[in-house]
Amino acid sequence: MWWILGAFGTAALVLVLASVFLFRFALARRPLTEIPEGGEREYLKRHPKGQAQVEWWAGVREARRWTERQHTEEWETRSFDGLLLHALLISPAHPGNRVALCVHGYRSCGHGDFGQIQRFYLEQGLRVLLVDDRAHGKSQGNYLGFGWLDRLDCKAWCQELADRLGPDCSIVLHGVSMGAATVLAAAGEPLPSQVKGVIGDCGYTSAWDQFGHILKRDFHLPVFPLLYTASLVCRICAGYWFQEDAPVKQLEKSDLPLLIIHGEADDYVPTAMSRRLLAASRDPGKRLVLVPGAAHAQSYAVAPERYQQAVMEFFRRIGMA
């Protein structure tokens, strides 16, 4: 009898420890480790499969250098739970009243996910607000919101833009990966009337679906029981359940104009999730653009002209062209 109880106790302890590890591994704040310019060869010696990271950091540095030549302003706002959030406003030479609020993805940054897109937006005369997600960059926070807490941060940035730029400004929300989940979830919240539409690039349907997919793909593990207990740890430490973190449910409350873009070769966030997101939206003119051959968050890099065309058609529909 006692050995049975001991076995159950040991199994429970292992499950708790594994759940805490999973939560901290996935959602605890960690700084980005930059590959310094000139250090690529040494990095590849240690990480033979790291060419994608090398190219990503090269793109970040190029975007930074470009941004330094533009007119920029550092912005801050306060989150609903008291965190100081940071963003960078980039303006064209002759700024108008249109602005793209750009939300980066998981453990990324604005220059990483919008390095090329921000140039396109400025060429079209838009201002660009690159936000640092909570627990990223210069924003405060110990744990990632994984799109759920961030949806309210996005709402706060929308209000900040509306307050500073006035009633005549027009705002489009644009997110990549976790940033897409953020703006899609924000679409289900009451937003300022200045918000005209939402662009989601390779977003997931819910945290539960996404973590479940990664558990199966990378670790060959079922969602039960680990994801249930990890969700409980997240609720205790970060304040939300994986199950409630569901952009797909938020879209059921939204009739904001919607454009979804997704790479057909994405095996990190399955393309099927975008189809479910599209189906959930109440926007009668909603559109899904699939990019053949594009892996996760690579649609713009693979097909920039098609991406730009889809965005401009969307802008014409919402009166922001």
Q: Where do the language-model regions lie?
A:
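N-terminal membrane-anchoring alpha-helices
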Residues: 1-56
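N-terminal cap/lid segment of alpha/beta-hydrolase-fold proteins
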Residues: 51-95
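The serine-hydrolase catalytic nucleophile loop
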Residues: 106-120, 133
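Conserved alpha/beta-hydrolase
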Residues: 121-140
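Alpha/beta-hydrolase active-site loop
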Residues: 144-165
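Hydrolase active-site cap/lid region
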Residues: 185-241, 249
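Short beta-strand/loop motif that positions the catalytic acidic residue
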Residues: 253-255, 260-262, 266
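Conserved alpha/beta-hydrolase "acid-adjacent" motif
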Residues: 267-273
